[in-house]
């Protein structure tokens, strides 16, 4: 198994370290445009091998020759969010970046599965899909895994329980229009509605929607990377080990939930083939309408980037 990580910033570098520590590949190639950064970080990680006891080879490069034959391509490259900047503000500047790195990477690894982390997430996943020419099953966005992790964390904090006992699904676009599905939120199998009053549930839903910007506002000069990298690597683990995990991911829908031809967060079965199935769960009218509205927002942004990719 060979994995390429594009972007040696905080998310990419942290994801690379997690991949090698979990020994999910025989080789990981870290790519960045800034000469010296991927090489230095890769060497630093490789030097931790005797301590962490992994044999995965870590290579840093500014080119793509070393990435040839990759099984998975993780795209984290892009400009970061800054305070006061919405994900949509990133649209123009990151479209060109994701377009370029996708074309470079897939020319060397035509059979890979692409996982996109760059923001705005769902739209950048669409860019990678269009520029790669890959089947829809092999292009996936890391959205719902992270959003769900945040929602589960906030619930665990509120109830003072283990996060392991909290189950939830956050669907829709990776942004303010995401849809935390309260109907499927449980703690050790107990519906959240039996444990918290409606106003507290609503507050946690709102905090989950603003989870990314909350961290941006704290950091002032950067954005989240520990939870995003962990979420991406959880997806990689599901693919590498063919686990058939059920995860909320940004996937291309073709009629499910009444949606067509758009990348949006939905429950999927993730295995060695990438998105092996999109699961269609029952949603109440409010959640279904919210999912439709979220998908419409993504579609509007995709229409904008179509002209940028001409």
Swiss-Prot record:
Keywords: NAD, Oxidoreductase, Tricarboxylic acid cycle. CDD domains: LDH-like_MDH (cd01339). Belongs to the LDH/MDH superfamily. MDH type 3 family. GO terms for molecular function: L-lactate dehydrogenase activity; L-malate dehydrogenase (NAD+) activity. The active site is at 174 (proton acceptor). Substrate binds at residues 81, 87, 119, 150. The lineage of its organism: Bacteria, Pseudomonadati, Chlorobiota, Chlorobiia, Chlorobiales. It comes from the Bacteria. It comes from Chloroherpeton thalassium (strain ATCC 35110 / GB-78). This is Malate dehydrogenase. The keyword Cell division does not apply. NCBIfam families: MalateDH_bact, PRK06223.1. Coiled coil: none annotated.
């Amino acid at each position: 198994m060979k994995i390429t990580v594009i972007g040696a910033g905080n998310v990419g570098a942290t994801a690379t370290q997690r991949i090698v520590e979990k020994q999910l590949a025989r080789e990981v190639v870290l790519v960045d445009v800034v000469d010296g950064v991927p090489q230095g970080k890769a060497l630093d990680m490789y030097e931790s091998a005797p301590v962490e006891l992994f044999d995965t080879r870590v290579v840093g490069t500014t080119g793509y020759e070393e990435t040839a034959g990759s099984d998975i391509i993780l795209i984290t490259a892009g400009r970061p969010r800054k305070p006061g900047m919405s994900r949509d503000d990133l649209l123009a500047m990151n479209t060109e970046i994701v377009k370029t790195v996708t074309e470079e990477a897939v020319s060397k690894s035509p059979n890979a599965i692409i996982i996109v982390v760059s923001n705005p997430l769902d739209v950048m996943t669409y860019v990678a899909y269009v520029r790669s020419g890959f089947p829809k099953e092999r292009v996936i966005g890391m959205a719902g895994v992270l959003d769900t992790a945040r929602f589960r964390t906030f619930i665990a904090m509120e109830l003072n329980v283990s996060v392991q006992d909290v189950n939830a699904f956050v669907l829709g676009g990776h942004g303010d229009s995401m849809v935390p599905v309260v109907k499927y939120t449980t703690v050790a199998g107990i519906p959240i509605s039996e444990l918290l009053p409606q106003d507290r549930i609503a507050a946690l839903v709102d905090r989950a929607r603003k989870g990314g910007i909350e961290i941006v506002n704290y950091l002032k000069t950067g954005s989240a990377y520990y939870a995003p990298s962990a979420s991406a690597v959880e997806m990689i683990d599901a693919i590498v080990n063919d686990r058939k995990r059920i995860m909320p991911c940004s996937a291309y829908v073709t009629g499910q939930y009444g949606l067509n031809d758009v990348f949006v967060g939905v429950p999927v079965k993730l295995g060695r083939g990438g998105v092996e199935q999109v699961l269609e769960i029952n949603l109440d009218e409010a959640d279904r309408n919210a999912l439709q509205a979220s998908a419409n927002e993504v579609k509007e942004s995709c229409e904008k980037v179509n002209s940028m990719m001409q």
